[in-house]
A protein has these predicted regions:
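Acidic surface patches and DE-rich sequence motifs
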Residues: 16, 121-122, 168
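Active-site-proximal loop/short-helix segments
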Residues: 169-173
């Protein structure tokens, strides 16, 4: 994987990837099939954020949006990275020297929540079921396991030199 750091450059905190200062603009879309990777690439963007999901349930309690892609851990005991492969292949076809960070929604899949009802959080919202609770030790342990498996996958992926970071998201307060 690529290395990333924040360093002072001309007195300004700057993102460095593989030792090189970067223009700190990134293109992100939830809708990778309709993503305009090539358009943004031609406009000078080299940093791209791709969204992936551990779970398979609503990601927004107010409107019940589902993940816009299959959850990596939606099936118990079987990680499925095929969506990651597809979105990265699509991006690199359009932006061959792209640098990638993944926005990882760490909300648990339904099977985990069904098996761990005492680890869920009732937000008190009307008609909303209890969901994964980031304050739960069991949730954090499961998230660590899933992150470890995802990182091991990324480190061994053919595109690993394009990856420089993760943006952890999700969980329900």
């Amino acid at each position: 994987m690529s290395s990333a750091s924040i360093q002072l450059h001309g007195g300004v905190p700057t993102l460095f990837i593989d030792g090189e200062p970067q223009v700190e603009m990134a293109y992100m879309t939830y809708f990778d099939k309709d993503g305009m990777f090539e358009d943004f690439y031609r406009a000078g963007y080299r940093i791209f954020c791709l969204c992936v999901y551990f779970g398979d349930q609503s990601i927004n309690p107010a409107n019940w949006y589902k993940p816009f892609a299959p959850g990596i851990f939606g099936t118990k005991g079987k990680a499925d990275f095929s969506h990651v492969e597809r979105i990265v292949a699509n991006l690199l076809h359009q932006a061959p020297d792209a640098k990638i960070f993944f926005r990882v929604n760490t909300s648990m899949p339904k099977w985990w929540e069904d098996e761990n009802p005492s680890e869920l959080n009732d937000e008190g919202l009307d008609r909303q079921p209890p969901r994964s609770n980031p304050a739960s030790r069991k949730y954090r342990e499961q998230t660590k396991k899933m992150l470890k498996e995802f990182l091991e996958y990324l480190e061994n992926a053919s595109f690993c030199d394009h990856v420089f970071g993760l943006h952890l998201a999700g969980g329900r307060q």
